[in-house]
Amino acid sequence: MMSHIRLVLCSALLSMMSCPTSGTIGEMLSLAASSNSSICHGMQFTEPTESFMGILPNETLPMFIFSIMHSEAVPKVGKTLRISHDMKLFGGEAVNYMIFVNKILYEPISYYNYTGSCRQQGLSSCVRVYSDLVNGSKGNPSVKLGFTAIELNKTKNTDFHNLGFKICFSCRDHNGIRLVVYNKNNRTAQLMMCPSELIFSQDFTINSTSVNPSEEAAVPLLNVTGYTCIALHNKNMLTHHSPALSSGSKVDNTLEPGCDSNVGLFGHSTGTDYGWGLANFFSAGITNSLQISQLEHVTDAIACKIAKTSNYTTTALFLLNKEEGEIRDHVIEHEVALNYLLAHQGGLCSVVKGPMCCSDIDDFRRNVSDMIDKVHEEMKKFYHEPDPFGGLGTWGFYGTIFGHVLQWIPIIIMVVVVCFVCSWVRK
């Protein structure tokens, strides 16, 4: 019964929301999983510092550059678009901007004499942008943004009356900040948009003449309000910004073919010292060389075991690091999806209250990857010294027998000498 009620509620919630454009949710989720993915609330907002709206003759070259700033901020020198943040989409900390394009204007030649006009500034056409269309931009006067005739002529056709420019919102990466456009009217979000309601008769037609030389010629634009550009910002972007493991860290399990990691451990007691002492006495110190040889073999085996253990450990860390990163990305994706679905209610934290709503998931994948790389660099410092007697190994079993015979020849000679001395003394 409860599952049926939940299904009905979910269906009702989805029916309240307009169907988003194709790929909208996928774009937001892929954005959340990217290097600029946000932490707090799934979306943590900052005020954009550069323009993300312009009149574009094509998709690559903006016709003019202007900045976007807070309505209470001090205007910058140059073309500045001041836009109020009349809507808090995802909570009180968000700085969201509404953009209103009212009409496109052409100033007659007589406007050369008007101080501050586009014509007087050497510009030939303008777009009047309002920061608050409903309240008549109270406290925030409208701003006209213009572009030069040279720029207009770049796309001029045979009929110079029709120049065909579109007003588009571009919310692609800009100076390291990625933006998303959210439309509060139909509750859709896109990374880049030039919707049909922003286009008048397919393209804007900027007339080069006016019926009344003392008035502006205006082409009205309808249904263009209600768009908000949202800046997604990762607060860890200065320290842990890049995706982890992007440096191509690879686990190297290759060791020398002759690497033997079997280490024999012997118990040590007082009797051990006595035994080796007697052996050294009767063998005239020959057993010392045997001990040194055995110690060298054990040292090599220990180094080999350290290298293998290090590789196994770094492999485990590599996989755990990758798994933790994937879990973190999925958590952020789910937070963004919840914020997207609950946007009309103020976001996830407006519905679910509590101190843990803002989940701060630090991203240390890069740090772990760097440590793994350092371990690999240290392990590369292990190297094999050439064995001056390595050639004997090619003799196989006979080489081993020959080596043992050589070790016992001094002892055999000493026994023969002692026997000879004893026989001589008896005589």
From Swiss-Prot:
Domain of life: Viruses
Keywords noted in UniProt: Fusion of virus membrane with host endosomal membrane, Fusion of virus membrane with host membrane, Glycoprotein, Host cell membrane, Host membrane, Host-virus interaction, Membrane, Transmembrane, Transmembrane helix, Viral attachment to host cell, Viral envelope protein, Viral penetration into host cytoplasm, Virion, Virus entry into host cell
Transmembrane residue ranges: 51-71, 89-109, 401-421
Keyword Iron: no
Glycosylation site positions: 36, 113, 135, 153, 186, 207, 223, 311, 367
Sequence ranges on the Extracellular membrane side: 2-50, 110-400
GO terms under cellular component: host cell plasma membrane; membrane; viral envelope; virion membrane
Residue intervals annotated with topology Cytoplasmic: 72-88, 422-427
GO biological process: fusion of virus membrane with host endosome membrane; symbiont entry into host cell; virion attachment to host cell
Family according to the record: Belongs to the reptarenavirus GPC protein family.
Function: mediates virus attachment to host receptor and fusion of viral and host membrane.
Protein name: Glycoprotein
